[in-house]
Amino acid sequence: MKNNNIDYSDYYARGGKIDKSIPLKIRKEIYDSEGERRIDERAIEVLTEYAENLPQTKELNTSKKTGDYYPERKKLHEKIMDTFKEDLICIQNDEPIAILMGGSPASGKSTFLRKYAPYLLKEEILKVDADEIRAKLPEYKGWNATQTHQETKDIVNTLLSDRTIGIPCKYDIIYDGTMNSTKSYYPLIALLKKLGYKVFIVYIDKVDEEVVKKRALERYKKSGRFVPMAVIDDFFTRGKSALNELKDKADGYMVVDGSGGDYKVIERGGMRLPKRRAYSKLGVPIVELEKQSKMESGGITQNSTPDYLQMFLGK
């Protein structure tokens, strides 16, 4: 029989131990007596305020004098980015494609992709997802996405810049964003088109704000991954103005009804996003290209370079 006199808020939460780096006063507000994460209005308010007042990880890991990340942190960023690139396929036999996802947090973007075009979730394509990136930062604990926001954004911006795209080859890209502003999308689309990409927009629509909030809170209760309610509020306040501006800039777009489980396409224009992509026939693994480049720099002759790699190496 459970001892109801014991305060379990300092013991275990579902999915792991309670984070004891959080002050006890705060823990008592955000966990119940059994160590479960609370998702009532008061608990979420306390958690949000606490997380928002923590120093940004960017601030903690950059030089006050230069504003640059410390060398060790730069190495971490490189390592994080490399993990998303190690299984990419260099596109040789077709045009590379880029998919720009839009829609609110917890709108079901991954669920739609799994149903419509599962290849978009494979490791052969560069997936740029802020949540997956911040999860690799050592300070990230699920509930403190706000604290990692600026640093995560810097890594995302690097992955979506000419410092990464097209180097050392062109590979397919999917960017999982909200598309609540055009600011970062205009230069990205311009860069992609300059490099010869076909650009597609996929936007998940028709998901009620209260449904999104409920999903986000239930996900936090189960996994500890927290999305501040203000982020969701901001998305719905802005509406689809960015989508309406950007969709004509893409080679093709689709708007999907995410209110049910069938994910029907309710609007589309331009080219159709391929439902299948056979990467084994489209090119070569990026690791082979990088290995060959190292061999070239080591003095291996052109005649020893396989024909299928010579085009990438400018032979």
Residue ranges and their predicted role:
Residues S104-P105:
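The conserved Walker
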Residues G108-K109:
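Conserved glycine(s) of the Walker
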Residues K122-L191, L195:
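Conserved nucleotide-sensing/catalytic segment adjacent to the nucleotide-binding pocket
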Residues I99-L100:
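Short hydrophobic/aromatic beta-strand immediately N-terminal to the Walker A/P-loop
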Residues F112:
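Hydrophobic positions on the alpha1 helix immediately C-terminal to the Walker A/P-loop
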Residues N5-P96, K249-K315:
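C-terminal accessory extensions appended to soluble enzyme cores
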